């Protein structure tokens, strides 16, 4: 049996085993459990039964983001008041949970930066950004930009995400606030900002919603890739804020960019309808781009199509997801998809077939 055939066989067996256990308990099978979604080399089998968390013990509200640590554990940030972070093993079992009292947890980044070990960077919509150890001990908290010279006293501030570069510099996306990307050094000193709010449908370097940010290290020099959710775009910048390029993804209101290998992954939180490209809930899917910024697969969405070099509008195909807020790419190539406003449900695993 070839490695790919073996992988497909194992993925089928794992989802079938989970389903049989559920049926033995007299519970109905979730919709689209075991369905195959995606395109080309990025096809997956849906496993909605991967997570073993007990809602009575480890409840969630919105499952905003997830990252895998170097030792293989999975860290999930939620906005449930009981805890900010749940830590899982790769089989979906909860190992532990902890809280910094954020209550509005939104962004989660794991990074070494210039440190010897990984740290977690937690972002709260209420304005707190905390660097902490992987067991939840605070190490650093960034200053409020209204108190360090970045903003005026009355400027809105509601950060959604941070990215950490190799020198430990922290890049903050103020995605629900004033739409700037703020730069801090590894000690938390404010260095500068770029971006700002735009109301124009095309305005490179300005944002209508700078929802996510990540370091893209696939090229000769690291770049900062930023989500422009409302305009269905990703935009790339130098680390000091010079605009390099952008890509338009019609119909896809994307979440943060996730770089893994040579590809960029993102959850589509809001989607379009045929002939209606407004932001609609319940139309989510996952989108995957190669290193030429071309969409190669849309798990849960329609197959990407280009016409005369231009990407045609992308829509949900099979309603596996409601509102995809993040994608965690595991070391084995599987995906775990986190969702916003989806009935306090846990993340869904997509088991890679090829």
Predicted segments with their positions:
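Conserved beta-propeller blade signature
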Residues: 74-76, 119-121, 170-171, 223-225, ...
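N-terminal secretory signal peptides and thylakoid transit peptides that target proteins
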Residues: 1-17
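Loop/turn-rich, solvent-exposed surfaces of beta-rich toroidal or solenoidal domains
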Residues: 252-302
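Blade-level signature of beta-propeller repeat domains, shared across WD40, Kelch, NHL, RCC1
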Residues: 323-354
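Surface-exposed loop and turn segments in beta-propeller and other repeat-based domains
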Residues: 48-57, 140-153, 192-205, 296-317
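Short loop/turn segments immediately following the C-termini of beta-strands
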Residues: 79-80, 125, 175-176, 229, ...
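Beta-rich, blade/repeat-based domains predominating
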Residues: 57-71, 101-115, 147-169, 200-223, ...
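Blade/loop signatures of beta-propeller domains
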Residues: 26-48
